[in-house]
Amino acid sequence: MLPLGAMLLAGSLNAMAQTAPAAAEKTLPTVVVREQAEAPEGKDALRATETRIGKGQQQLRDIPQSVTVVTEKLIDDRNLDTVKEALKNTAGITFLAAEGGEEDIRLRGFALQATGDLFIDGMRDPAIYDRDTFNLDRLEVLRGSASMMFGRGSTGGAVNQVSKTPRLIDEHQVDLTLGNHKYVRATGDFNIQTGESAALRINAMTTKADNNGSGASLDKRGAALAYRNGIGERNEFQVNLYHLDNNNGINYGIPYIAPTTGSSDRVLLPLDPETYYGAASDYNDSSATLIGGSHTHRFSRDSELKTQIRVGQFERDQRSGAIRLCTRGVNQQTGAVTNPQCPSSHSLETFGPNTQLTRGNHLKIQDMDTAQFQSDYSGKFEALGMKHDFLAGVDFSREERTVYAARSSAQGGVDISKPTTLIGTPNDGAWVDESSRVLRVNNQYTAQGWGAYVQDTAQIAPAWKVVAGLRYDNLTGDYDSFSLPQNAAGPLSAESYRMEVSEWSPRAGVLFQPTPQQSYHFSIGQSFNTSGDAYSLGASNVDTPPEKSRNIELGAKLDSADKRFSTRLAVFRSTKYNERNTDPDRPVVTLSGERHVAGFEVDAVGRLTSKWEVFGSYMWLPVARVDRAAPCPSTGQCAQGAAGERPGDRPSLTPEHSGTVWTTYQFTPRLRLGAGLNFRGKQSPTRVEWTVPSYVTADLMAEYKFDFDRLTLKANLSNIADKLYADQLYPGHYIPGAGRTLQVTASLKF
């Protein structure tokens, strides 16, 4: 892994060597840049220079934290049709195979999805559906504490999904992709100028496949519509509609196995990653519907107020089951022998086609409604002899979530047991009637929150800026838990809990920008997240204060003299210093845990020559440790610690090395070739002493343009060595990464 990181660093130093000497003019470049109708989109380059992840439109060089941008061009080059796959193209991202079947995203080893750190156009995006890239212009990954901008959140950072917006041009594109596993994907992107300052944009998608390369079928469709009026004028309005339907299969996971009899280590099963052992009746349905609007009022070229409102409806209906090696055991309560036909242990020495597997029952059925409002002001002015870039804003939100459970036969429902299967008979077509389940409300959660923030970037000297920001958040949550008697259909009893949290989130930093090509920063920020985000409220945690975290970073953003190549470097330390633990003596949650990570990151993105383009992202995380967890109980039996982590361990899902490299070369005006690597070092799921092996996968791309660039044919070969690796980890199982896939895309522009 280290040579790849060294290659990125060497490329960046080469670009730095091209940096021109400082100009005589001392004025720094404008921080807030207004969008122009002809501004390039993410599909035009791998390199991005601006972002709105800092609320106002800003140059990346003026944000005192690390930001990685995955543009639409990179998404298209590598045929990344899900947000999860796109995020794998940034260093430090890993995935937990969560109990609910969703992708629990980790950044620098800290959870993002569980703490609500995914956003669409700067507004929070609930974590109960599987996201697609068909309407994305780019993904922005802010690394480190993000609470100053977004409120409650994690230590690792935040991910902002930037939607495609209408432009003042008539331009359309239709793509058709065919691949192995009967993969078919069609997308359309239609931009229509409807007036001097108005435009309409429509995006649509449909995707089907028998297998996504890692055991799950695909059947999804989506549509998005955006209309803008007053583009570039004093008052600009936009209306957005978005809908996505997923009717996919689900590979809930495959168990690990001991390499030898009696070994405490675990390895991956030697199986084709596309192998499926779940029931044919398992499925993973989810949907998202968003309706929103925005108004931007420009007081001047350097001052604007942007107000957004959005309502959303989300649903998830997942019927699946964990696959386990069938093992003989004893029921601790009754003494009865379970699975008497199966061995008491498994290893690769005894593994074969007749090894028996059990299928579990895991339901995740929920719906969620959201309403959000936010208003953000950004402006430039001079005061006290200094230039200021000022940001301020307020936001309000309401979330309502209902989670359902199935009644057992003793409660007036049905008991469904899935048949076992054998290693040698995957895809056996086993079926159970999921429609016969009788559902009831299990819990309901309603939350209202509001926040306000201010930030000022003051230029205290020609090359120096200081950044100071502060945010206040108030969150109120009401949680109702419903239960039935163990052996009766009623009555339904309820317990109610209430949470109220008020927190301040500060951020401070210093920027040193001696030339337009160089920007160095030092920053410190604090974040928090509540019990209502990461856990369901209940008697054990209703009175638990928020977790708090701190991030310290020293970094640089460097551009080549021709501004075609950019490098980002950073060293950082992130600490969660009061992490939740379950008290070993009482059924309550306490803030007794602590963990920290420290490392180095480098991104190198842009054009090395007019024909050679590169995107690289690498993280080295040599320091990662669980410092403190729950104390031992009075019984003397020591707990396993915070969220299952054990003191002294390296936290789960924190590989020492991770990253990606992608490069393309324009050999002729019509022919472009590309190649890339994705890699992750060895890592562990929670509560285990063994590690999952590291992996490197390689991808190839070839693109040929016909008919004056109107028609393009592109072929992608991913995981060319058909590498077996664990993509998402859990203590009892893993979800394999996709095996070798071949996809061919025809694109027509008109």
Q: What does each model-identified segment do?
A:
Residues F134-D137, M148-L225, N229-E236, T289, ...:
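Outer-membrane beta-barrel translocator/receptor signature
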Residues Q366, F390, I552, D649-F750:
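Conserved C-terminal beta-signal and adjacent last beta-strands/turns
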Residues T207-N211, A224-G230, R234-R298, Q313-M368, ...:
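Acidic/polar loop-and-plug regions of large Gram-negative outer-membrane beta-barrel proteins
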Residues L28-I169, L554, P731:
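Acidic, small-polar-rich N-terminal luminal/periplasmic segments of exported/outer-membrane proteins
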Residues R573-T575, L591-R687, A721-L724, T745-K749:
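Gram-negative outer-membrane beta-barrel transporters
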Residues T296-R298, E304-R310, F314-A322, Q513, ...:
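Membrane-embedded beta-barrel scaffold of Gram-negative outer-membrane proteins
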Residues R228, M368, K387-L391, D395-E399, ...:
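Structural signature of Gram-negative outer-membrane beta-barrels, strongest in the C-terminal barrel
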Residues I291-Q313, L357-F482:
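Face-selective signature of the C-terminal outer-membrane beta-barrel domain
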